[in-house]
Amino acid sequence: MLKVAALYQFAPLPDFREVREPLRALCVGLSVKGTILLAGEGINGTVAGMPDAIDALAAELQTGTLFSGRLDNLELKFSQASVMPFARLKVRLKKEIVTLGDPATDPTRAVGIYVEPKDWNGLIAAPDTLLIDTRNAFEVAMGTFEGAVDPQLARFGEFKDFVAQKLDPDRHRRIAMFCTGGIRCEKASSYLLSRGFKEVYHLKGGILKYLEGIPESESCWRGECFVFDDRIALGHGLTESRRAGRLMDGAPGDD
């Protein structure tokens, strides 16, 4: 059984271009495959390999010399795959590790309030909480939280238009957001704060961490969670979906 790691952290990485090749060499040496994005604002990726290899990569990212402790708050979600879900390794340089397209939004400076999965149900059950799914529309169609607003995004960059057209800081006093692994909703929370919203929450570790830790009997999640690899979707306990392969024919990009 292979180990899959979804990882990200917003952190200033002014030398992100210089660490690309050493990071690629490390992954090649560990026979790890997947995609890692590097930008001045941090790191984002999903990789797979033998359990010892993934553990070694995670340890190097968090405490090794390559990043010198700058990724000590790396958000990690682990799951399993019966076969390698990636065809190759890609380490890419980007302007943003998740593309919003607003240069003024800086998650390394300010983000909303993290909510642990165990506290999520209580927050979204409150009548004055507006719950927003920050993923693309095709992902929402496969599964989402009960009562969540679907902004009908074709790509994450359209979130800005949704905010301008549908949200108002004076009317929407408490907003809770979620996404697959936490990165999109974290950046969305930073954007909302920059637009004058005061009480902004986001699910720490995203849907994957929630599905990993919350029993299905207590869950407010309905459906399955799309993932951007050959497994297509995961269910409670991060088990591979048996249904999703019949629903999706290939995986689109992760914008």
Swiss-Prot record:
Rhodanese domain sequence ranges: 125-219
Source species, domain of life: Bacteria
UniProt cross-references to Gene3D superfamilies, sorted A to Z: 3.30.70.100, Rhodanese-like domain
Catalytic reaction(s) noted: uridine(34) in tRNA + AH2 + O2 = 5-hydroxyuridine(34) in tRNA + A + H2O
Pfam family, one: Rhodanese
GO molecular function: oxidoreductase activity, acting on paired donors, with incorporation or reduction of molecular oxygen
Signal peptide per UniProt: none
Alphabetical list of InterPro entries matching this protein: Rhodanese-like_dom, Rhodanese-like_dom_sf, TrhO, TRHO_N
Active site feature: 179 (cysteine persulfide intermediate)
Enzyme Commission number(s) of this protein: 1.14.-.-
SMART domains xref list: RHOD (SM00450)
GO biological process: tRNA modification
Record key words, sorted: Oxidoreductase, tRNA processing
Role noted for this protein: Catalyzes oxygen-dependent 5-hydroxyuridine (ho5U) modification at position 34 in tRNAs.
HAMAP family listed in its UniProt record: TrhO
Family per similarity comment: Belongs to the TrhO family.
Protein name: tRNA uridine(34) hydroxylase
Provenance organism: Nitrobacter hamburgensis (strain DSM 10229 / NCIMB 13809 / X14)
Phylogenetic classification of the source organism: Bacteria, Pseudomonadati, Pseudomonadota, Alphaproteobacteria, Hyphomicrobiales
Name of the gene: trhO
